[in-house]
Amino acid sequence: MPVTINGNGSITGLSVGGLGSGVVNTASIADGAVTTDKASGSVKGIEMVDQWRITSTKSNSGQSVFDSNWERNDLNSNKIGSAGMSESSGVFTFPTTGKYLVIAFGYATGNNDRYMGIWIERTADGSNWTRGAEGYGSAYNSGSNTFSQVSIQYFFHVTNTSTHKIRLKSDNVGTCNWDGAQDIMRTGFTFIRMGDA
């Protein structure tokens, strides 16, 4: 079929892939002609944001995984995107592959504790856990109910949602309380999908 340029400016007879290399450049593409299906990496923008917290205070000494009492922050409909994170026994699963910024934060009270910290732990095989980030505060004071706040970040490249997972762990020299609540963010996670894997 011959290629025909019609009087109204339309073209008929042109097959898919029929234009040679360099015929169409970026400047000639209409502003609304590129869909997210054709975009890649961070060009799509942020596609997912999700925030989770513990709902009750966790009291422990030494190292301990935050394995219960998690809920999504439901006060401000904070989840962006159709699919957010899922959680089971403190282990968080990502909805899709991609590059994620993981932010963990903890609010603790202690009594003469030299250090109280949190770790972002990651696994790439679903079973072996290693530290991705850690941060510490201190409640080294002779009085009781000394407060400490810790915030850490980790950039996680998720290539397999079945094996790449995240969890939160505490590390304290003595017994301290990591505060949780149902109506305010005190101890928990924020997950932001920054781009494609």
Task: Give short role names for the model-derived ranges.
Residues 1, 6, 131-135:
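Short, functional N-terminal and low-complexity linear motifs
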Residues 44-197:
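Extracellular jelly-roll beta-sandwich "head" domains, especially the C-terminal globular C1q domain
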